[in-house]
């Protein structure tokens, strides 16, 4: 399989997570989960108390990450997860907390 064919299989999603998701280790746990799933991108807190993330990787792994984000770490109380696919040229090198 060529490099271009491999690149075409990589998906990128923008995600927003709402609820009690700040001050409960959500970003740190998200980084750990993303590393375990070999995903790339980032996660960050927003001023409105929600968390946003850009997740990049194979579709099956992204599906697993989205399922995990619906509950997050034990102290989190997730009330809503929204996501949309983004078409970006950039390929992230790793998954990190911002």
UniProtKB/Swiss-Prot annotation:
Catalytically driven reaction(s): an acyl phosphate + H2O = a carboxylate + phosphate + H(+)
Gene3D superfamilies from the UniProt entry: 3.30.70.100
Swiss-Prot/TrEMBL keywords: Hydrolase
Coiled coil regions, renumbered to chain: none
EC class (word): hydrolase
Record carries keyword Hydrolase: yes
Family matches, as InterPro entries: Acylphosphatase (IPR020456), Acylphosphatase-like_dom (IPR001792), Acylphosphatase-like_dom_sf (IPR036046), Acylphosphatase_CS (IPR017968)
Pfam families: Acylphosphatase
GO MF, one annotated term: acylphosphatase activity
Top-rank taxon, per record: Bacteria
Catalytic machinery residues: 27, 45
Signal peptide: none
PROSITE patterns: ACYLPHOSPHATASE_1 (PS00150), ACYLPHOSPHATASE_2 (PS00151), ACYLPHOSPHATASE_3 (PS51160)
SUPFAM superfamilies per record: Acylphosphatase/BLUF domain-like
EC number per UniProt: 3.6.1.7
Domain Acylphosphatase-like: residue ranges: 12-98
Family: Belongs to the acylphosphatase family.
Protein name as catalogued: Acylphosphatase
Gene from which this protein is expressed: acyP
């Amino acid at each position: 399989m060529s490099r271009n064919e491999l690149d075409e299989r990589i998906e990128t999603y923008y995600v927003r997570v709402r609820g009690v998701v700040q001050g409960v280790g959500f970003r740190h746990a998200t980084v750990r989960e993303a590393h375990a799933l070999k995903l790339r991108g980032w996660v960050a807190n927003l001023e409105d108390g929600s968390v946003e993330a850009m997740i990049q990787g194979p579709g099956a792994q992204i599906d697993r990450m989205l399922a995990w984000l619906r509950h997050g770490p034990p102290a989190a109380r997730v009330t809503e997860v929204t996501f949309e696919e983004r078409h970006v040229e950039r390929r992230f090198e790793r998954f990190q907390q911002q």
